[in-house]
């Protein structure tokens, strides 16, 4: 990291283990930007926030980025993407609900609402968010996770419980037919294409 830091003004690192970012930062003389780790995915959360602002703020073209009170329902694993999205929702004054099977939720933090019922999570939500059920490095847990997440798919019955104006997001790549149906991936409410 020291050698690289001598040649650049910043380092954007996509790593598997978050500890590697921490280790890099101890020897770097330039900023280290987390592009993805097993702990968080802040760049994805920023991109998603911009999509939500573009869709729901009164007039982003003149600098009014207010999305206060909007609700994001994340249906899936309490993982790096969920953690980062919850953090940016808190900063922007949005509500965040996580629907995960027992044992896959994020720790309670007093901000987010956690449920084990996807229908409860999406009720009236402005944004429905899906992510892969089997993250990078978890391939050995695929069968177990797919079984645990049965019933946590973004599909038409779930979308029908959200607000009429709701959009669907996914950090991609998506396993269509698993965590999200083709119908919802390509629907008019999808902000994926």
What is each stretch, according to the model?
Residues 1, 21, 85-86, 118, ...:
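Generic hydrophobic/aromatic pocket-lining and core-packing "Φ" positions
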Residues 1-53, 176:
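Phosphate/diphosphate ligand-binding glycine-rich loop within oxidoreductases
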Residues 12-14, 32-35, 41, 74, ...:
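General beta-strand structural signal in soluble alpha/beta enzymes
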Residues 179-193:
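Short, electropositive alpha-helical surface patch
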């Amino acid at each position: 990291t020291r050698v690289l830091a001598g040649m650049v003004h910043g380092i954007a690192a996509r790593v598997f283990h978050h500890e590697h970012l921490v280790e890099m930062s101890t020897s770097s003389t330039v900023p280290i930007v987390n592009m993805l780790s097993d702990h968080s995915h802040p760049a994805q959360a920023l991109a998603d926030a911009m999509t939500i602002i573009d869709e729901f703020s009164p007039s982003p073209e003149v600098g009014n980025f207010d999305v206060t009170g909007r609700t994001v329902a994340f249906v899936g694993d309490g993982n790096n993407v969920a953690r980062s999205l919850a953090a940016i929702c808190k900063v922007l004054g949005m509500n965040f609900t996580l629907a995960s099977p027992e044992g896959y939720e994020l720790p309670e933090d007093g901000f987010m609402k956690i449920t084990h019922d996807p229908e409860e999570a999406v009720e009236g939500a402005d944004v429905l968010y899906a992510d892969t059920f089997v993250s990078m490095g978890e391939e050995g847990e695929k069968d177990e996770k797919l079984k645990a997440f049965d019933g946590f798919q973004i599909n038409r019955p779930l979308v029908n419980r959200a607000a009429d104006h709701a959009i669907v997001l996914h950090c991609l790549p998506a396993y269509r037919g698993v965590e999200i149906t083709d119908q919802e991936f390509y629907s008019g409410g999808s902000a994926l294409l």
